[in-house]
């Protein structure tokens, strides 16, 4: 990527409109705009489908929108659109959001939430026939049994970062610390 600012195209204005002219829950389904126009009609369909797939809280809908908009702005700066993203773009985005010394660096938990939002977007895009393959790679992981359920093998998005759980954090007495 070189020096910051090199290799980036001029960025268009991509924003979130948190309310739309509709009744009920649809009023809280965000719109993604480029300037004064809808960014992409298929992306809008994704947001309209979120309540049907269990995302009903207006706070969750808003979080999805802002996660997606930051990604769209990044892609726009790279000269790409939402449905043209590749695994290399995800890697570059990770460097920008997690590893650079930039002011906009985010926590692992925030990164994982953004990955979950984008993963859902691209899985939806695959189901709708908009893309052949999502820009994320997956690997099989063992999910241990919980609450009487059997353990199973599941596909895990490689872009997720491991976040320390409270059970992983232990007190170490000073005598044991070296």
Where are the language model's segments positioned?
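A detector of helix-start/N-cap boundary segments at the beginnings of structured domains
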Residues: 33-34, 80, 166-169
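Compositionally biased accessory segments in Actinobacterial proteins
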Residues: 1-3, 140, 144, 158, ...
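Intrinsically disordered, low-complexity segments enriched in Ser/Pro/Gly/Ala and basic residues
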Residues: 11, 136-137, 166
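Basic/aromatic DNA-contact patch characteristic of tyrosine site-specific recombinases
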Residues: 1-73
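N-terminal core-binding DNA-recognition domain of tyrosine recombinases/integrases
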Residues: 44-59, 68-151
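Long, amphipathic, Lys/Arg-enriched alpha-helical "connector/arm" segment
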Residues: 148-178
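A generic short alpha-helical patch detector that favors 3-5-residue windows
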Residues: 39, 63-64, 82-85, 172
